[in-house]
């Protein structure tokens, strides 16, 4: 997919629409450490170019029928729906903007700067949440939980809204809310997808990008 090619969804889930999660690409960050907009950064895939935002959107579209981009209304992916931020700041603002656009729907979230997260892992998050009736499902490994590749149910999003209203913007602490049912993917669950430090490589700097690209070429 080239940056100029409008995106089209490919997912075809069998569940009723209202029961399916909406795929949310988080792409609203300021990219201060990178020095330019990461979401619009073009990388090679199989000889073709795609942006990091397009890559995340493609992965989510393998799992979700509805996929949109929470990019503070910047329209970083041609043809994809662009969402304005909600209240708060950082990823929480993107999540709450999406929650406002899709009330009563769960959200399957993937940040554009997590380019190595596979669609199969995202699908596992959906399954684990559905099987256990979880309000929040996310991976957890020795470096901690990863809230930017996670499934947020309606109750978790409501809790996030209350936290943001009280000035708490971090997603990392949301799982500690006592009224939420939280499901974690353990390192054993993650093992089929590769080493966690490679799955969750975060492209914050040009050096991070170079490392991820080198790993891709090696693999």
Range-by-range predicted roles:
Residues 2-4:
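Serine residues within intrinsically disordered or low-complexity segments
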Residues 7, 11-199, 210-217:
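Nucleotide and nucleotide-moiety/phosphate-recognizing core
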Residues 204:
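Active-site rim beta-loop-alpha module in soluble metabolic enzymes
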Residues 207:
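Conserved active-site and cofactor/substrate-binding residues in soluble primary-metabolism enzymes
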């Amino acid at each position: 997919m080239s940056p100029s090619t409008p995106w089209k969804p490919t997912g075809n889930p069998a569940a009723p629409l209202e029961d399916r999660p909406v795929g949310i690409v988080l792409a609203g960050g300021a990219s201060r450490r990178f020095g330019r907009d990461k979401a619009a950064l073009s990388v090679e895939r199989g000889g073709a170019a795609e942006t990091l935002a397009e890559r995340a959107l493609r992965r989510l579209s393998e799992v979700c029928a509805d996929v949109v981009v929470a990019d503070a209304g910047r329209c970083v992916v041609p043809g994809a729906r662009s969402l304005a931020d909600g209240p708060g700041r950082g990823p929480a603002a993107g999540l709450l903007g999406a929650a406002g656009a899709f009330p009563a729907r769960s959200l399957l979230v993937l940040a554009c700067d997590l380019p190595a997260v596979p669609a199969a892992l995202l699908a596992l998050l959906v399954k684990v949440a559905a099987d256990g009736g979880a309000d929040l499902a996310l991976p957890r490994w020795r470096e901690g939980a990863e809230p930017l590749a996670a499934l947020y149910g309606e109750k978790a999003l409501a809790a996030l809204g209350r936290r943001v209203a009280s000035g708490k913007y971090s997603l990392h602490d949301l799982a500690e809310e006592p009224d939420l049912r939280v499901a974690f993917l353990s390192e054993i669950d993650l093992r089929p997808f590769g080493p966690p430090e490679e799955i969750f490589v975060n492209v914050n700097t040009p050096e991070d990008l170079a490392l991820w690209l080198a790993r891709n070429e090696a693999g």
